[in-house]
């Protein structure tokens, strides 16, 4: 299986004995929107006759699936014998390679929020909010889940070795959050991509619908795809963001990464919030990554530094919405952080107190997807060559 630009999976079933063989599929799977409209992407669509891409199974990613007698394998994408330029996983690989060229290995951990919806013939699409009378934030038992899905998802994730740290109820009834174990960037993104598919399919088997939309209901808070990020030296070593004795315990490398994220805040939005609905979440007042600022254990800032230090020192990027493609959201984050290092940027002072009542900046994410696309034209989407 592989990811399209929307973060949706494509693939095929093959017998295990043929796992090492490359597949061939129309490259248009990468040039479709969620309504299956083929987009006029030069070099990949009608202008070149809808040619094939090649799928290259990565046997090292093989893991037990959630369907009977079925394993899951991630595939890399090639086009004319070269890595497919518009492939989301390839975009993340380029970002990882750029950091490795500087001697650092990016480490990521994903927090994935979503809503479980129940059948409702009167609701749009036939599904509406899940009814949990005793719901409470971070609730357990019937205070967080009346469907049994939490245990089903956790059990399947354990079998698939997706390395979940935990699952819990979130702010509104039916909203849940999965926390995934920290790891090397590509492995972490692979696991997040697979986990999205697994959760949706297992819910469907029980008659429910899981949605990762940024904000499916205006009366409820949105769902995010928070990405935790740090660096370690290539070949092993201690967390390069941690520096005992430095201001806030953060190294100059960490401050420059924060500086890059803040400098390119508006340009990050289009890959972090890739749908029209995403911008119903990115508004002030619901601690969702709106302002171009950072803070010390402050959820009203977009780039939060949790209180832990040492090996756990990290930047939590709170902008990406649940519908973001894990590969692309991670790639643009790593690229923006790298530009902060290349350009020697500093992050300035952290946001203090309530960042919505008294933000320390007037810069924020765009209000519409079209504005986000325009912002991307005025920021550097990838590390400079010079």
Regions found by a protein language model. Give the residues of each.
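Catalytic-core signal marking the mid-to-C-terminal active-site face
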Residues: 194, 201-204, 208-209, 232-289, ...
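Loop-centered beta-sheet repeat module
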Residues: 189-196, 205-212, 227
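Short glycine/proline-enriched loop/turn "hinge" motifs that connect secondary-structure elements
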Residues: 62-69, 105-107, 167-172, 220, ...
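Short, hydrophobic beta-strand segments
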Residues: 73-79, 176-182, 229
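Short, conserved phosphate-binding/catalytic loop or strand-edge motifs used
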Residues: 112-116, 170-178
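Active-site-proximal beta-alpha loop/turn segments in soluble metabolic enzymes
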Residues: 130-140, 173-187, 217-222, 238-241
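A generic structural motif
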Residues: 4, 78-84, 142, 182-188, ...
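ATP/Mg2+-dependent ligation/transfer catalytic cores
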Residues: 1-166, 188, 208, 361-380, ...
């Amino acid at each position: 299986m592989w990811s399209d630009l929307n973060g949706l999976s494509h693939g095929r079933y093959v017998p295990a004995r043929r796992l090492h063989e490359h597949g061939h599929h129309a490259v248009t799977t990468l040039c479709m929107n969620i309504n299956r409209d083929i987009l006029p992407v030069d070099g990949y669509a009608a202008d070149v006759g809808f040619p094939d891409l090649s799928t290259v199974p990565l046997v090292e990613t093989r893991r037990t699936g959630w369907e009977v007698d079925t394993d899951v394998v991630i595939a890399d994408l090639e086009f004319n014998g070269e890595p497919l330029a518009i492939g989301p996983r390839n975009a993340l690989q380029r970002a990882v390679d750029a950091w490795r060229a500087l001697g650092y290995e990016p480490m990521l951990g994903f927090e994935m929020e979503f809503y479980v919806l129940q059948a409702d013939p009167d609701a749009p699409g036939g599904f509406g909010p899940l009814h949990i009378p005793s719901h409470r934030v971070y609730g357990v038992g019937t205070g967080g889940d009346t469907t049994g899905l939490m245990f089903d998802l956790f059990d399947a994730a354990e079998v698939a070795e997706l390395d979940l740290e935990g699952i819990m109820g979130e702010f509104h009834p039916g909203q849940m959050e999965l926390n995934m174990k920290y790891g090397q960037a590509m492995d972490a993104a692979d696991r997040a991509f697979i986990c999205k598919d697994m959760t949706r399919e297992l819910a469907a088997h029980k008659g429910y619908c899981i949605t990762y939309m940024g904000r499916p209901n205006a009366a409820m808070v949105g769902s995010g795809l928070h990405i935790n990020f740090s660096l370690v030296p290539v070949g092993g070593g201690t967390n390069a963001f941690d520096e005992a004795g430095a201001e806030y315990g953060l190294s100059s490398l960490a401050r420059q990464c924060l500086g890059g994220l803040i400098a390119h805040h508006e340009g990050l939005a289009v890959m972090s919030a890739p749908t029209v609905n995403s911008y119903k979440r990115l508004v002030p007042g619901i601690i969702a990554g709106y302002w171009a600022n950072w803070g010390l254990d402050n959820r009203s800032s977009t780039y939060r530094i949790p209180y832990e230090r040492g090996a756990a020192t990290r930047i939590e990027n709170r902008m990406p919405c649940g519908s973001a493609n894990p590969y692309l959201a991670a790639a643009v984050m790593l690229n923006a952080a790298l530009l902060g290092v290349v350009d020697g940027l500093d992050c300035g002072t952290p946001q203090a107190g309530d960042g919505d009542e008294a933000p320390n900046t007037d810069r924020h994410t765009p209000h519409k997807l079209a504005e986000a696309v325009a912002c991307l034209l005025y920021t550097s989407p990838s590390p400079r060559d010079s």
